[in-house]
Amino acid sequence: MLRFLRHIPPFLPTLIVLVAICYLSLDADPFPDKDSWFTFPGSDKVVHIIMYGGLTATFCFDYYRRVAAPCKLWLLIVALVGIVMELLQAHMGIGRTGDFVDVIANSLGALIGIVVGNRLFTRLFIKVES
């Protein structure tokens, strides 16, 4: 399986996840059905944590495939992406609002993603190469 993973173009998985997050963040109404089973107070914050945690873990995956070293810089990069998305939501006039609590959720997701990504991919890539 690792041979297959090494043939994926560099940072393609990260780009795919980033484009999906941009679409979901900047579309006026990406989920028109507000009465789904997943809707509860604070559910949007859970979604932010999952999205940005997934983005950071994907960055770690791509980084480890090439470098096989911890990727702490991605925490800052993904947190900045989250801040930029919230600023764009606030100022683009698309019917969305930027929210400081969303920035916190994005950053928390990035932190969780870096911890999970570093632990998971250290074991996956570094043990195999040793």
Where are these regions (language model features)?
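Small-polar-interrupted transmembrane alpha-helices in polytopic inner-membrane proteins
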Residues: 13-25, 73-91
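Short helix-capping/hinge motifs at transmembrane helix termini and TM-loop junctions
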Residues: 26-28, 64, 93, 121
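Short, charged juxtamembrane terminal tails flanking transmembrane helices
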Residues: 124-130
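Residues within alpha-helical transmembrane segments of multi-pass membrane proteins, especially transporters
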Residues: 27, 58, 80, 84, ...
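Membrane-helix interface segments
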Residues: 8-9, 66-73, 96-100
